[in-house]
Amino acid sequence: MKSVYFVAGLFIMLAQGSWQRSLQDTEEKPRSVSASQTDMLDDPDQMNEDKRHSQGTFTSDYSKYLDSRRAQQFLKWLLNVKRNRNNIAKRHDEFERHAEGTFTSDVSSYLEGQAAKEFIAWLVKGRGRRDFPEEVAIVEELGRRHADGSFSDEMNTILDNLATRDFINWLIQTKITDRK
C-alpha cells in the first residue's frame, strides 16, 4: 500500500514537471508580429482578446501553483501516514497473540481428528461395546477447554455428543421389529 502511494506521488510530481516545461517552452519562443497583426492591435476587439489571454495566463499560473500545493500536501500526508502507521503497528504487535490462538486451534483440530478416528475404528470393529463410558467422556470433554473461554459453545458440543450417543445406543439396543 505504501508503494502505491509513493508511485502516485511520483507520478504527480513528474506530470507537474512536464507541464511546467512545456509551458516554459511555449512562453520562451519569440513571437513574430507581422504588419497586419500590428494594425489589429489598434482594434478594440483585439484588446479584449489580449485581456482574455492575460487572464488565462494568470489562471494558468494560479492553477499550477494550486497543483504544486496539492502535491506537497499529498506528500506530507503520505509521510505522516507512514510515521503514524509505524507507531500503531508497534503498539498493535504488543497486544497481538496470534501464536497462542493458532496453537489452541491446532490442538482442537488434532483432538477432533482423533475422536473421528476412534469412532470409525469403533464402527469397523463391529460395535464391540454396546454402551459408552459417559461419565469418563463428560469429565474428559470438560477438561478440554479452549483458551478463548467459549464455555457455551463447548457445552452445546458436549450435549450434542451425548444426544448422539444416546441415539446410537437406542439404535443398537432396539430390535428390528420394534423399529417399524
Curated annotation (Swiss-Prot):
<dbReference type="GO" id="GO:0042802">
    <property type="term" value="F:identical protein binding"/>
</dbReference>
<feature type="signal peptide">
    <location>
        <begin position="1"/>
        <end position="20"/>
    </location>
</feature>
<dbReference type="GO" id="GO:0005737">
    <property type="term" value="C:cytoplasm"/>
</dbReference>
<keyword id="KW-0165">Cleavage on pair of basic residues</keyword>
<dbReference type="GO" id="GO:0005886">
    <property type="term" value="C:plasma membrane"/>
</dbReference>
<feature type="site" description="Cleavage; by PCSK1">
    <location>
        <begin position="91"/>
        <end position="92"/>
    </location>
</feature>
<dbReference type="InterPro" id="IPR015550">
    <property type="entry name" value="Glucagon"/>
</dbReference>
<feature type="site" description="Cleavage; by PCSK1 and PCSK2">
    <location>
        <begin position="83"/>
        <end position="84"/>
    </location>
</feature>
<dbReference type="GO" id="GO:0070374">
    <property type="term" value="P:positive regulation of ERK1 and ERK2 cascade"/>
</dbReference>
<feature type="propeptide">
    <location>
        <begin position="84"/>
        <end position="89"/>
    </location>
</feature>
<keyword id="KW-0732">Signal</keyword>
<feature type="modified residue" description="Phosphoserine">
    <location>
        <position position="150"/>
    </location>
</feature>
<feature type="site" description="Cleavage; by PCSK2">
    <location>
        <begin position="52"/>
        <end position="53"/>
    </location>
</feature>
<feature type="modified residue" description="Arginine amide">
    <location>
        <position position="127"/>
    </location>
</feature>
<feature type="site" description="Cleavage; by PCSK1">
    <location>
        <begin position="145"/>
        <end position="146"/>
    </location>
</feature>
<keyword id="KW-0372">Hormone</keyword>
<dbReference type="GO" id="GO:0014823">
    <property type="term" value="P:response to activity"/>
</dbReference>
<dbReference type="GO" id="GO:0045722">
    <property type="term" value="P:positive regulation of gluconeogenesis"/>
</dbReference>
<dbReference type="GO" id="GO:0035774">
    <property type="term" value="P:positive regulation of insulin secretion involved in cellular response to glucose stimulus"/>
</dbReference>
<feature type="propeptide">
    <location>
        <begin position="131"/>
        <end position="145"/>
    </location>
</feature>
<dbReference type="GO" id="GO:0007189">
    <property type="term" value="P:adenylate cyclase-activating G protein-coupled receptor signaling pathway"/>
</dbReference>
<keyword id="KW-0597">Phosphoprotein</keyword>
<feature type="modified residue" description="Phosphoserine">
    <location>
        <position position="152"/>
    </location>
</feature>
<dbReference type="GO" id="GO:0010737">
    <property type="term" value="P:protein kinase A signaling"/>
</dbReference>
<dbReference type="GO" id="GO:0050796">
    <property type="term" value="P:regulation of insulin secretion"/>
</dbReference>
<comment type="similarity">
    <text>Belongs to the glucagon family.</text>
</comment>
<dbReference type="GO" id="GO:0005615">
    <property type="term" value="C:extracellular space"/>
</dbReference>
<dbReference type="GO" id="GO:0006094">
    <property type="term" value="P:gluconeogenesis"/>
</dbReference>
<keyword id="KW-0027">Amidation</keyword>
<dbReference type="GO" id="GO:0071377">
    <property type="term" value="P:cellular response to glucagon stimulus"/>
</dbReference>
<feature type="modified residue" description="Phosphoserine">
    <location>
        <position position="108"/>
    </location>
</feature>
<feature type="modified residue" description="Phosphoserine">
    <location>
        <position position="54"/>
    </location>
</feature>
<dbReference type="Pfam" id="PF00123">
    <property type="entry name" value="Hormone_2"/>
</dbReference>
<feature type="site" description="Cleavage; by PCSK1">
    <location>
        <begin position="130"/>
        <end position="131"/>
    </location>
</feature>
<keyword id="KW-0964">Secreted</keyword>
<dbReference type="GO" id="GO:0042593">
    <property type="term" value="P:glucose homeostasis"/>
</dbReference>
<dbReference type="GO" id="GO:0031769">
    <property type="term" value="F:glucagon receptor binding"/>
</dbReference>
<dbReference type="InterPro" id="IPR000532">
    <property type="entry name" value="Glucagon_GIP_secretin_VIP"/>
</dbReference>
<protein>
    <recommendedName>
        <fullName>Pro-glucagon</fullName>
    </recommendedName>
</protein>
<dbReference type="GO" id="GO:0090280">
    <property type="term" value="P:positive regulation of calcium ion import"/>
</dbReference>
<dbReference type="GO" id="GO:0005179">
    <property type="term" value="F:hormone activity"/>
</dbReference>
<feature type="region of interest" description="Disordered">
    <location>
        <begin position="23"/>
        <end position="58"/>
    </location>
</feature>
